[in-house]
């Protein structure tokens, strides 16, 4: 599809699950996108944020909280969170 300037644009850009790297299909109505804000030492929003997309497969298995903790720990938003996957 083209816009008014004649540039090619897509109507749908597929997202990938941040936890599994699976492509999230258009009909996956259980998927969510969560934005985590970066704050300074005073707790004020710095204008930066990180978005995580979780597919319905992860949410249906009940692994979304552990996956989000793992992703936030990897990116440096949280520290020292207990994880069931590390205990095995």
Curated annotation (Swiss-Prot):
Protein encoded by which gene: rps21
One example GO MF annotation: structural constituent of ribosome
Entry's localization field: Cytoplasm
Subunit record text: Component of the small ribosomal subunit. Mature ribosomes consist of a small (40S) and a large (60S) subunit. The 40S subunit contains about 33 different proteins and 1 molecule of RNA (18S). The 60S subunit contains about 49 different proteins and 3 molecules of RNA (25S, 5.8S and 5S).
A Pfam family the protein falls into: Ribosomal_S21e
Official protein name in the record: Small ribosomal subunit protein eS21
Gene Ontology BP, a term: endonucleolytic cleavage to generate mature 3'-end of SSU-rRNA from (SSU-rRNA, 5.8S rRNA, LSU-rRNA)
GO annotation, cellular component aspect: cytosolic small ribosomal subunit
Key word Phosphoprotein present: no
Homology family: Belongs to the eukaryotic ribosomal protein eS21 family.
UniProt organism field: Aspergillus fumigatus (strain ATCC MYA-4609 / CBS 101355 / FGSC A1100 / Af293) (Neosartorya fumigata)
InterPro entries: Ribosomal_eS21, Ribosomal_eS21_CS, Ribosomal_eS21_sf
Function: Required for the processing of the 20S rRNA-precursor to mature 18S rRNA in a late step of the maturation of 40S ribosomal subunits. Has a physiological role leading to 18S rRNA stability.
Lineage, uppermost ranks: Eukaryota, Fungi, Dikarya, Ascomycota, Pezizomycotina
Keywords: Cytoplasm, Ribonucleoprotein, Ribosomal protein, rRNA processing
């Amino acid at each position: 599809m083209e816009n008014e300037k004649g540039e090619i644009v897509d109507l749908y850009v597929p997202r990938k699950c941040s936890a599994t790297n699976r492509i999230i299909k258009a009909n996956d109505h259980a998927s969510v996108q969560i934005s985590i804000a970066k704050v300074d030492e005073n707790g004020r929003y710095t204008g930066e944020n990180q978005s995580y997309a979780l597919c319905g497969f992860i949410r249906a298995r009940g692994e979304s909280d552990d996956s989000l903790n793992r992703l936030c720990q990897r990116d440096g938003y949280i520290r020292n969170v207990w994880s069931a996957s590390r205990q095995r």
